Amino acid sequence: MKNVGDLMQRLQKMMPAHIKPAFKTGEELLAWQKEQGAIRSAALERENRAMKMQRTFNRSGIRPLHQNCSFENYRVECEGQMNALSKARQYVEEFDGNIASFIFSGKPGTGKNHLAAAICNELLLRGKSVLIITVADIMSAMKDTFRNSGTSEEQLLNDLSNVDLLVIDEIGVQTESKYEKVIINQIVDRRSSSKRPTGMLTNSNMEEMTKLLGERVMDRMRLGNSLWVIFNWDSYRSRVTGKEY
């Protein structure tokens, strides 16, 4: 500190009289250096988080349209949306050690995918493994295992069962084949048995979901403090045009 103070005094003597020094004491200089160090450290942390997210996006199934989805940029225009946002935030905060799953149901374009992606993006930042995948993609991957793809059906089921959070999109859009029902049943059963939650996105109501997936799957989806959030407001897509959407 003495050396810094001596340096400041020498510099002040060398400066022209009309120039005012930014720092008058060694303490002020050190405080500024500490502040700048904290700013650089925060910037570096943000860059590292961004790089980590970029690396994981290719493995998470989060599509480019939803890679920037967050709780902060979720549009709230009614009480129902506020409730959905609050539930999603709470789900993330209580994720560790929680078996609770979630189902987001409602009409297309109401923000189900946005909030599901926001949950996954936040969990990625917290070091969790996540995967968002449609039923159609699951079934396509399953069919590939029959064509000597190098991955067996068992390996694929294990991969789907071992991520910290699996979100299955477009439940109810599929052809309702018996094989699809069996596969989804196996996935949910394995995940619940290993205390790993599952998310589902659907346009169907509870009665339709129960008919489609069966009571056993729906029972698994109710374990713990599981969520069923109904997105029953107007579609965003019907109110936007051009580049806004």
UniProtKB/Swiss-Prot annotation:
EC number: 3.6.4.-
Induction statement: Induced by hydroxyurea.
UniProt effect for mutating residue 177 to D: Loss of DnaC ATPase activity, decreased ssDNA binding, decreased DnaB loading on ssDNA
Enzyme class: hydrolase
Reaction(s) catalysed (UniProt annotation): ATP + H2O = ADP + phosphate + H(+)
InterPro entries in the record: AAA+_ATPase, DNAC/IstB-like, IstB_ATP-bd, P-loop_NTPase
GO biological process, one term: replication fork processing
Site note Probably involved in interaction with DnaB protein, residues: 69
Record carries keyword Hydrolase: yes
A GO cellular component entry from the record: DnaB-DnaC complex
One Gene Ontology molecular-function label: ATP hydrolysis activity
Effect on the protein upon substituting residue 146 to A: Loss of DnaC ATPase activity, decreased ssDNA binding, decreased DnaB loading on ssDNA
Domain of life the protein comes from: Bacteria
Gene3D superfamilies the record matches: P-loop containing nucleotide triphosphate hydrolases (3.40.50.300)
Record key words, sorted: ATP-binding, DNA replication, DNA-binding, Hydrolase, Nucleotide-binding, Primosome
Subunit structure, interactors included: The helix loader is a DnaB(6):DnaC(6) complex with a crack opening large enough to allow ssDNA into the central cavity. Can occasionally be detected as a component of the replication restart primosome, which is composed of PriA, PriB, PriC, DnaB and DnaT.
Record function comment: Required to load the replicative helix DnaB onto single-stranded (ss)DNA, to initiate chromosomal replication. Also loads the DnaB in the replication restart primosome (composed of PriA, PriB, PriC, DnaB and DnaT; DnaG primase associates transiently with this complex). DnaC alters the inter-domain and inter-subunit interactions of DnaB, inducing an open ring conformation that allows ssDNA to access the interior of the DnaB(6):DnaC(6) ring. Has ATPase activity only in the presence of DnaB and ssDNA.
Family the UniProt entry places it in: Belongs to the DnaC family.
Protein name: Replicative helicase loader DnaC
Gene: dnaC
